[in-house]
């Protein structure tokens, strides 16, 4: 990390956390654990050429599971942190990936927390928050299209007969 080592970067992400509601001292516990553990897989990962820390998200998710189990956290919380750590790199690619590859992840009730983790991660690095803004815009477009009965979730218009309950494009 240009900002130092992985630990320095991890601590830096906490500076960008936003409190929940009006209580300035209250933070989302899941997000805090996600920030703490999002790069835990980096020391376990391999590097090849210019691709440093290859596979660190997957390795980190497994390590986070073991760590949280050992501390006695319950399975639902562990599953939430697994989702955040495993997918923390995905928002960077969101604007360029086809909907078929991202729909399931964006449908998760945890996706807003994942975007927030990504914002903190990006803001604490030399990159800044531009990638977050692009990913957030892609997510907002997805949500807007999903709510529109005349568009598919990818934004394509539905034909008139399909919108009125026709064959929905099936033969």
PLM regions and their residue ranges:
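Surface-exposed beta-loop-beta
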Residues: 1-8
